Amino acid sequence: MKLSSDFFEIFAIPVAWQVERSQLDSRYRSLQQEFHPDRYASKGDVEKRLAVQTASLINQAYETLKSPLKRAQYLLELKQIDASQDSHITSDGAFLMRQIELREELSEVRDNADPFAALESLRTGVESSYSEQQSQFQAQYQSQAYDEAFNTLAKMQFSAKLLDEIEQLEADLEDQ
């Protein structure tokens, strides 16, 4: 395997938004077995180092392709678009206002009579929006509307971050 291979090439899958998760998982397990550093323990230092680098690349590729957000960023980067998380924010005012409202709702969950129900309701709405954003990204990417896909990616980042915050709050509430 070439260390310079793109992530889709590593997993022998087509470059596309839609990834067959079972195929990705199966190929990952196969590559892990083939390039696990322990298999190279009796080899020379160069081979050991290459095995570690290859295993690291395989892990990075897998984590990127299995995550909708990371996969979207990677697809845009393959099109020479800087999709790093700090590179953009959305200019959609209505979307940004909704994000503020959702964060206020999140901050008030602890004060709710049933914080777990409030959190679940919030999660359901955010997951629905995130799913819609992923569908939008897929359509925009497939139609080569990369600027629009880039803007949708910014929205996906907001939603993914909010979902992480919801999970963190849920863990905090369970620990109380």
Each language-model region and where it sits:
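C-terminal accessory/regulatory regions appended to core domains
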Residues: M1-Q176
